[in-house]
């Protein structure tokens, strides 16, 4: 299981607005400290996390944060409507559209996904594969 994801940023206030628009509606708790931004899903005592923590901070080496080519972080939403809502909220919070929410021929029929770039250029996917919702084949 992946325990956490760290995303580099050169502009933490812009990154804060972007990631809060996506992660708070998905149930993540937020805190801000000396090192940067922390988004953590609450975990009941005695249980294991169901998704990784997300940290957004300036790179430790002091060099500028750059987006990795081919690297992407995907966040699962419970419904297709939530994917659309989160995609819109992320655009309003400074994200760039990387592909409107919808089905893609290259993926399974029930995989509904939208793509974005955060304010630092990192690629983000928002997806739902809820079997109770329409698929590409419906």
In which residue ranges do the predicted regions lie?
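Short glycine-enriched loop/turn motifs at secondary-structure junctions
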Residues: 1, 66-69, 108
